[in-house]
């Protein structure tokens, strides 16, 4: 067995696998997209078999690209779209329903009922989360209540529940391991992040059988070995983390006060608060950043549902661009005198508003508004939403000194225009790393460090390199006016607003 690391990044619209060598260099890549399904308004589903096939295919592509065999891989690390809920038959490993994706809003009535019963403070205290259909627990309750015969099978222990990582590990190990890691468990709405255990009281409220839940491990742990029949070798799976927590690790945000923001389909900002669990008073989430050697590190998180998806909307629904990479050049052509705001509440609004019923809108249209102004508004909406998150974090985090530097990653950060606009709106420096795929790098480090191949946290942090720092360059009066316009626009989109 060689010293190579295989990392798998299973995302919302595609799966990517990478092979890293001992020096943390990428030597092989495989990527495949897979379809999403929208069976009803507000519903988003994946076929779990599509996910599984994309994982196997990208692994084989990455190995071929690297020119190595599976037997040369020392360890596997997995990172995944969080909250997406998968149910499968314990005996066959076959999914019993399409995966309900994190973006899916069908459980909104379940959340509203729990809120009416005054239960949100209890859930928040135990899990650090809010009652929103974004999280797995209410999706799971909906499935158990709605799919005929499912609850009876779950009670008998015949059905497994898991986030995507858990499903993949089950398949990769030939059904021998039903496990997950602490970061993914912390996003389910049924995991007590103080006790680091599934919470019986919350399970009882949601009527979820404990028999269907996976075992929860540290992020760097022994998750099992791959079935030799799949890849031709038994490879240990040694690292697992939800995608946003993996990006915290990949960005080397190991110290309290360090902050990262990932820009993919959505946008997710996490602020490391160390071993202190900070309870937000500004509608942020308290979550597990990572758990290593039995020690839990916490984070404040703000979740934005639509970031890169707004660019996809410009491309797919409006036809303003042919490929996503064209959007920055188009935005640069926008009339600077027009102030157009896009509130991309296509599936509701996330932090700090948490309004499942909010819907998107565009404000400030004139006869001269065209594709360029739409493009700029779409990119600026990401900056404004990030400002909302950073503003809330500064209010919650006692350690904030007003000198926050934001480390960024994800597909959107390749755009210099977007990153400069982000720095301008935040009035804070934005650091873009040399290696942009920090999510998959984080998964690779978890596995490689567990295998003893890559360095410890400190040495890994020293290895992090900045490509460019974007410093704010906007007049304060202009910035304040722009933010005021944004907040007025958001206020008009909220489902419950002052008239």
From Swiss-Prot:
Coiled-coil ranges (or none): none
Residues annotated as binding glycerol: 82-83, 134, 243-244
Keyword ATP-binding: yes
Binding residues annotated for ATP, in chain numbering: 12-14, 265, 308, 312, 411
Family annotation (PANTHER family): GLYCEROL KINASE, SUGAR KINASE
Function: Key enzyme in the regulation of glycerol uptake and metabolism. Catalyzes the phosphorylation of glycerol to yield sn-glycerol 3-phosphate.
NCBIfam families named in the record: glycerol_kin, PRK00047.1
Protein name: Glycerol kinase
Species, as recorded: Agrobacterium fabrum (strain C58 / ATCC 33970)
GN (gene name): glpK
């Amino acid at each position: 067995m060689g010293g190579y690391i295989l990392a798998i990044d299973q995302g919302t619209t595609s799966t990517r696998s990478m092979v890293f060598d001992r020096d943390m260099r990428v030597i092989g890549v495989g990527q495949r997209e897979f379809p999403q399904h929208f069976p009803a308004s507000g519903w988003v589903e994946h076929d779990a078999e599509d996910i599984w096939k994309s994982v196997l295919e990208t692994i084989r592509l990455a190995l071929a690209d690297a020119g190595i065999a599976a037997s040369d891989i020392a360890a596997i690390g997995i990172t995944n779209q969080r909250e997406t809920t998968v149910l499968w038959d314990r005996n066959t490993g076959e999914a019993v329903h399409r995966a309900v994706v994190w973006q899916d809003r069908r459980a909104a009535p379940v959340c509203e009922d729990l809120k009416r019963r005054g239960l949100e403070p209890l859930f928040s205290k135990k899990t650090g989360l809010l009652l929103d259909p974004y999280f797995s627990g209410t999706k799971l309750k909906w499935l158990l209540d709605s799919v005929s015969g499912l609850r009876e099978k779950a009670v008998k222990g015949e059905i497994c529940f898991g986030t995507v990582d858990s499903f993949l590990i089950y398949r990769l190990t030939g059904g021998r391991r039903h496990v997950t890691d602490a970061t993914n468990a912390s996003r389910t709405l049924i995991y007590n992040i103080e006790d680091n255990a599934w919470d019986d009281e919350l399970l009882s409220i949601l009527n979820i059988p404990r028999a269907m839940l996976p075992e929860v491990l540290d992020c760097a742990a022994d998750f099992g070995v791959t079935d030799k029949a799949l890849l031709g070798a038994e490879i240990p799976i040694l690292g697992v983390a939800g995608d946003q927590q993996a990006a915290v690790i990949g960005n080397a945000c190991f110290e309290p006060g360090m902050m990262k923001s990932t820009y993919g389909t959505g946008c997710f900002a996490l602020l490391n608060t160390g071993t202190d669990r900070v309870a937000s008073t500004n509608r942020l989430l308290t979550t597990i950043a990572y758990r290593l050697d039995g020690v839990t590190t916490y984070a404040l998180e703000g979740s934005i549902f639509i970031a890169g998806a707004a660019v996809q909307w410009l491309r797919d629904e409006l036809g303003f661009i042919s490929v996503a990479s064209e959007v920055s050049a188009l935005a640069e052509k926008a009339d600077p005198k027009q102030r157009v705001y896009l509130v991309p509440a296509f599936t509701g609004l996330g932090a700090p508003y948490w309004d499942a019923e909010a819907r998107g809108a565009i404000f400030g249209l004139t006869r001269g508004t065209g594709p360029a102004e739409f493009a700029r508004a779409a990119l600026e909406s990401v900056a404004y939403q990030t400002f909302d998150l950073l503003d809330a974090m500064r209010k919650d985090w006692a350690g904030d000194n007003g000198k926050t530097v934001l480390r960024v990653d994800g597909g959107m950060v390749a755009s210099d225009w977007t990153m400069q606009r982000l720095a301008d709106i935040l009035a804070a420096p934005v650091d873009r790393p040399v290696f942009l795929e920090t999510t998959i790098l984080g998964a690779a480090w978890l596995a490689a460090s567990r295998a003893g191949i890559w360095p410890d946290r400190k040495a890994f942090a020293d290895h992090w390199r900045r490509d460019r720092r974007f410093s704010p360059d906007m007049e304060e009066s202009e910035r304040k006016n722009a933010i005021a316009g944004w907040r007025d626009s958001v206020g008009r989109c909220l489902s419950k607003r002052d008239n």
